[in-house]
Structure formats: C-alpha cells, structure tokens
C-alpha cells in the first residue's frame, strides 16, 4: 500500500486497485452471468478467465448460469415499480434472487455467446427483467462497475457486445 501512496494514488483509487469495498472494508464482489445454454462452454471459459484475474486481485467472483433456465420475458407491466419491493411479479424463476445478488455485488459481469448477431433469448429476457426492476426501484445497480464478455466464432461479436453493454 505504501508504494501506491508514494505514487500519489488517492485512497478511493487505492481501494479499487487492491479490491477493497470502501463502504465496508470488505473484499469487493463481482457477480457474473453466463447466458449460454451450455453450462461450461466457451462463454463460461471466457467468464472464468476474467474471474480468475479478478480473484488474483482479491475480488470475490461468482458465476451464475442463466442460459439453461426458462425465463419469461418482461411485459413492462410496471408492478415492480408500484410494489417497490425490488421484485418482478413473475417469481417462478430465479430472476428475483439474481436481482438481489446484483444489488449486493460491487460489479456485474455479463457473458453471452453470439446467436444470430445478438444475445440469446434467455439472456435477453433475464436482462430485460432485472434491469427493469432495478430502474423502477430507484436504480438498484447505479454506480456499479460493469463489463461484458462475448464468445464468438466468426461474426456478430460487435453487435452482441454492444447489446450487452447497453444494459450496463
């Protein structure tokens, strides 16, 4: 830590460098979401590579596989905004639990394979619902660090990457 201070790096920046959550003094946490239907396919491998690097810096990571779940799309019914309970009214899948994990994390990492120059349908449904709930409940994910990872074979990587980045 001393060498960072000698270089004139402030405490806030120092906390980011060494992976310390400045609010609580706890290790930073990143939650990663694998939007691939294949649990340990190329998207998982890319997320795992990022997670391994984060863990080397003392940042806890968890990879959650959402790509093989049946997740209904957002209907923009607005009930999550009316209820103000940080939950989607469709509670029959894992989305509400994942919203809370994203809220508690310091960073969010999204990963998807390329499906016809876009993210897969399950990932789209998941992201639409989680970010709609977040926006209707006071911006639950505001001020969080976000990043995206795309697994691509030939083409369509840039539109898919842009689509993920539009959420974060």
Residue ranges and their predicted role:
Residues 11-27:
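Short, Lys/Arg-enriched N-terminal segments with co-localized hydrophobic residues
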Residues 29-57:
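N-terminal beta1-alpha1 ligand-phosphate binding loop
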Residues 33-35, 66, 150-153:
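Cofactor-binding loop segments of dinucleotide-utilizing enzymes, especially the Rossmann-like FAD-
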Residues 59-69:
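A short beta-strand-loop structural module common to alpha/beta enzyme folds
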Residues 69-102:
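Cysteine-cluster motifs in flexible loop/terminal segments that predominantly coordinate metals
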Residues 89-168:
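Helix-loop-strand module that forms the ligand-binding subsite of alpha/beta enzymes
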